A protein has these predicted regions:
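Glycine-rich, flexible loop/turn motifs
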Residues: 1, 63, 156, 160-161
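Single conserved hydrophobic/aromatic residue that forms the stacking wall/gate
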Residues: 1-7, 11-12
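Conserved structured catalytic cores and adjacent interaction surfaces
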Residues: 15-17
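Short, surface-exposed polybasic-aromatic patches that bind anionic ligands, especially phosphate groups
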Residues: 21
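A Trp-anchored, charged/polar loop motif used as the substrate-binding/catalytic surface
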Residues: 24
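Divalent metal-dependent catalytic cores for phosphoryl transfer on phosphate-bearing substrates
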Residues: 27-148
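N-terminal intrinsically disordered, cationic/polar leader segments
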Residues: 129, 153-158, 169-171
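Long, highly charged low-complexity segments enriched in Glu/Asp and Lys/Arg with interspersed Ser/Thr
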Residues: 143, 160-162, 167-168
Length: 172
């Protein structure tokens, strides 16, 4: 099933983002085992951005050049949900499971103003949305801190809506 859904190679950054999220999801699924269906959370986490690469067009060097027409019209959330629906039907996955996975993909941006088609309304979709936000924000911090000296404050970071301070050297 995963080979059918994922298809071509994902960007390295997207793969790292998903891998980081999978580790966090696995940990939090254990922490909240009384509320979370671990399998559903991990499946939704793995699939949440898999249509993202089809949202863009790429140069011969593999660099994003612009949004694809389909990416502009639908976006990766809708394209991902459509593919999950089609593949799940083809594989005989129960419709209720397919709908939950589609909901997780459609809601993982959390709020409509951040691109979500719907708000997350089950525990797994809420947790996926929070994990996605956490990992994306930490990546912004990683990139910003790498360009700062100890004791320096960055200019305003649009995606964070604030500045970033580097209080100490990084360990990594």
């Amino acid at each position: 099933m995963l080979r059918s859904l994922v298809g071509s190679e994902m960007c390295i950054r997207d793969r790292m983002h998903t891998a980081n999220m999978m580790k966090t999801a696995d940990f939090l699924a254990g922490l909240y085992a009384d509320v979370i269906d671990r399998g559903l959370l991990l499946a939704g986490t793995f699939l949440h951005d898999f249509a993202k690469e089809r949202e863009f067009t790429f140069s011969k060097l593999g660099l994003v050049t612009e949004y694809s027409v389909k990416g502009q019209l639908l976006g990766h959330l809708v394209m991902g949900a459509q593919e999950v629906s089609a593949v799940a039907a083809e594989l005989g996955i129960p419709e209720d499971k397919s709908i939950l996975l589609q909901h997780m993909i459609l809601s993982h941006h959390g709020e409509p103003e951040f691109g979500a088609a719907v708000k997350p309304i089950c525990a797994e979709s809420e947790l996926l949305s929070q994990i996605d936000m956490l990992d994306s924000r930490m990546e912004i911090y990683r990139e910003t801190l790498a360009g700062l000296q100890v004791g320096e404050v960055s200019s305003r970071i649009f995606a964070l809506d604030k500045r970033v301070f580097k209080p100490h050297e990084l360990n990594g």
